[in-house]
């Protein structure tokens, strides 16, 4: 590592990954990125990132690697690539929302080639990421290598020491249950209000007045006012992708529930996500 600022590798440039990578670039961090989507790669390079042709190239460059990919098997695949060229002791921060047991398995996988993996799960959305105001749920924070620990404050204003590795993932899943429950509750509330022909803006103002409206839910609310005929094309595909992630997270959360009835509630919430986001249809539901 040169000087105080580590060289960072970032793998996974979806909505959150792109925002976090952009934040690092804004702070002057030297960054190399990799994603399978050439468009997101081009956007990051346009902001000043170096492009990598593989995850192995990322590992050869970086003092720290961040991973922000959709699921556990994607994380595992990235780790295989990193292991081809990583130096022993390379810190790997997993921002993906995966099962705590999968996180522990990934830590062992990285350890085979000398990687030091921690869960650093993120909450707050892309807007907070761009502003450096994410909440982080960190597993094994006390054991974070210095190069990795130095990064946390670049994109976070609230860091939670969740417990040992895997605890950050568990806390993020618990966090997401409330997030998606609020989305679902607001969708139901809007349907009731619209059916009764009352002003939904007034309803939202009342929520704000009593402090009942979280920032993530407020960011979601405009989706509820979009006419169905406008939920088409790329926008519909984007919402479906969001729903896929929500359902994945809620299935994992349901698996962690120790009380059967509560697990059933989370499963019902998971199944409701397409309707909540306004993209339910018979063909997609059958897939």
Where are the predicted features?
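NAD(P)+-binding Rossmann beta1-loop-alpha1 motif at the extreme N-terminus of oxidoreductases
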Residues: 1-67, 90, 161, 195
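Rossmann-fold dinucleotide-binding core
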Residues: 8, 78, 97-174
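Hydrophobic beta-strand scaffold residues
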Residues: 31, 51, 116-118, 159, ...
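Rossmann-fold NAD(P) dinucleotide-binding segment
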Residues: 55-116
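Glycine- and other small-residue-rich loops at beta-strand/loop junctions that grip anionic moieties
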Residues: 67-68, 95-96, 137, 162-163, ...
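Helical "substrate-binding/catalytic lid" subdomain
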Residues: 168-287
């Amino acid at each position: 590592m040169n000087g105080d600022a580590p060289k960072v590798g970032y793998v996974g440039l979806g909505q959150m990954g792109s925002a976090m990578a952009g934040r690092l670039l804004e702070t002057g961090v030297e960054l190399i990125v990799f994603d399978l989507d050439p468009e997101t790669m081009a956007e990051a390079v346009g902001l000043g990132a170096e492009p990598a042709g593989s995850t192995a190239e990322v590992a050869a460059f970086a003092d720290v690697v961040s991973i922000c990919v959709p699921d556990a098997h994607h994380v595992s695949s990235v780790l295989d690539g990193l292991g081809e060229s990583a130096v022993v002791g390379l810190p790997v921060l997993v921002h993906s929302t995966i099962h705590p047991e999968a996180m522990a398995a990934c830590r062992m996988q990285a350890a085979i080639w000398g990687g030091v993996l921690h869960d650093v799960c993120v909450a707050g959305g892309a807007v907070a990421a761009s502003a450096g105001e994410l909440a982080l749920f960190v597993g094994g924070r006390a054991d974070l290598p210095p190069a990795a620990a130095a990064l946390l404050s670049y994109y976070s204003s609230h860091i939670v020491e969740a417990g040992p590795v895997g605890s950050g993932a568990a806390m993020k899943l618990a966090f997401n249950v409330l997030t998606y429950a609020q989305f679902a509750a607001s969708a139901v509330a809007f349907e009731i209000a619209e059916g009764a022909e009352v002003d939904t803006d007034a309803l939202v103002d009342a929520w704000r007045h009593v402090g009942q409206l979280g920032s993530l839910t407020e960011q979601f609310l405009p989706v509820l006012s979009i006419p169905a005929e406008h939920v088409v094309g790329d926008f519909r595909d984007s919402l479906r992708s969001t729903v896929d992630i929500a359902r994945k997270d809620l299935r994992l959360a349901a698996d962690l529930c120790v009380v059967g009835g509560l697990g059933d509630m989370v499963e019902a919430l998971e199944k409701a996500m397409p309707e909540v986001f306004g993209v339910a249809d018979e063909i997609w539901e059958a897939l």
